Every structure is written in structure tokens, then in C-alpha cells.
A protein has these predicted regions:
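Class I (Rossmann-like) S-adenosyl-L-methionine-dependent methyltransferase catalytic domain
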Residues: 1-73, 113-170
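Short catalytic micro-motifs in class I SAM-dependent methyltransferases
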Residues: 85-89
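A conserved beta-strand element that flanks and buttresses the S-adenosyl-L-methionine
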Residues: 82
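Residues in flexible loops and secondary-structure boundaries
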Residues: 75-77, 95, 144
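A short glycine-rich, Lys/Arg-flanked "PGG" loop and its adjoining helix->strand segment in the class I
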Residues: 96-108
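Short N-terminal helix/helix-N-cap motif within the alpha/beta-hydrolase-1
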Residues: 91-93
Length: 170
């Protein structure tokens, strides 16, 4: 079992209350009938609020499917993709591969809603010091959007030193 596997299976806990834009407020922002893929859904807390949400997570059996994002092949079309703290780990090559996969499974006008960590290992749980956080920034967002045919629609600070980011597939 890897450090990140152990950390998310045994130590990490969700706390949507501490985020203003990327927490429970998303319930009012996203159309209730949207077809949503929740990437790294954790405990799948949005599932009960959206009838067409499908949650994937490599470390949590509350997901609809326990699978790494890079290995997931959609079983249907989605129009909203949530990455609320899930594609924040590893080096640039790792994140680039994840975004390439995101490009491959999205279509024109799909929306991606992110909670991005700017590289801070500030989780309060034991084992966080072993996790490599990717240093998200506006520059990285612009770089990946340009490279993979997305449009950066929104980049703004959320509470807790995180970024609320929206991309649209062009």
C-alpha cells in the first residue's frame, strides 16, 4: 500500500463546510439534472443531491466505482466534472497525464469544477507529510488549458487557501 493510498483510506476526512465556493454551495450552482462525474468523490457526499452523479475514487468504497481516474473509462456521457481536491497530487508529469485523460473523456462545452491546492501540505491528519501536493497556480491552469483545449472560465481564491476554478472544454 502506498503512502497516498494509506493516507486516504485511513486518515483523510471530508470537510465541505470550510470551503465557501467549492463546498456545499455547489448544490445551488450545479443543475440538479446535470450528468456529473465526481472524480475522487471520497465518501460520495454529493450523491444524494444529484440523481445523475457517478462518483469514482481509488481509495474509498463509498464511491460508485473504486478506480483511479487515469484508469476510468466512462460508461455514459457526462457534462459536469468535479475535481474537488482530487487531482492535486504528484509532479507535473502525473497531473499532465490526468488532464490528458480528462481531455479524452470530455466533449465540447463540458464544465470542469475544481478545488485546487496550491501545493500546501496543510491537512491536519497524520501522514500528510508523506504526500506530494501539486503546486496549482493560475499559470499552471493557463498552461494546461492551452495545451488540452480547455478555456479557463474562473480562477479565484476560496477559503482555506484553495482555488475555485472552472474550465470549459472548447
Amino acid at each position: 500500500m502506498t503512502d497516498i493510498d494509506y493516507y486516504f483510506r485511513h486518515n483523510w476526512k471530508p470537510d465541505y463546510d470550510k470551503f465557501e465556493l467549492t463546498g456545499w454551495k455547489l448544490l445551488d450552482k450545479i443543475d440538479k439534472n446535470a450528468h456529473i462525474l465526481d472524480i475522487g468523490c471520497g465518501y460520495n457526499l454529493f450523491k444524494e443531491h444529484f440523481p445523475n452523479l457517478y462518483g469514482i475514487d481509488p481509495y474509498n468504497d463509498k464511491a460508485d466505482e473504486e478506480i483511479k481516474f487515469e484508469d476510468y473509462q466512462p460508461h455514459k456521457n457526462f457534462d459536469v466534472f468535479l475535481a474537488l481536491g482530487s487531482l492535486n497530487f504528484g509532479d507535473e508529469k502525473t497531473v499532465d497525464n490526468q488532464i490528458k485523460h480528462l481531455y479524452n473523456i470530455t466533449k465540447k462545452n463540458d464544465v470542469i469544477i475544481w478545488r485546487q491546492n496550491p501545493g500546501l501540505g496543510d491537512h491536519p491528519w497524520q501522514g500528510v507529510e508523506e504526500i506530494k501536493f501539486f503546486p496549482w497556480s493560475k499559470d499552471y491552469n493557463e498552461h494546461f488549458c492551452s495545451k488540452y483545449n480547455f478555456e479557463l472560465k474562473t480562477f479565484m481564491k476560496d477559503k482555506g487557501d484553495r482555488y475555485y476554478v472552472e474550465w470549459s472544454r472548447t
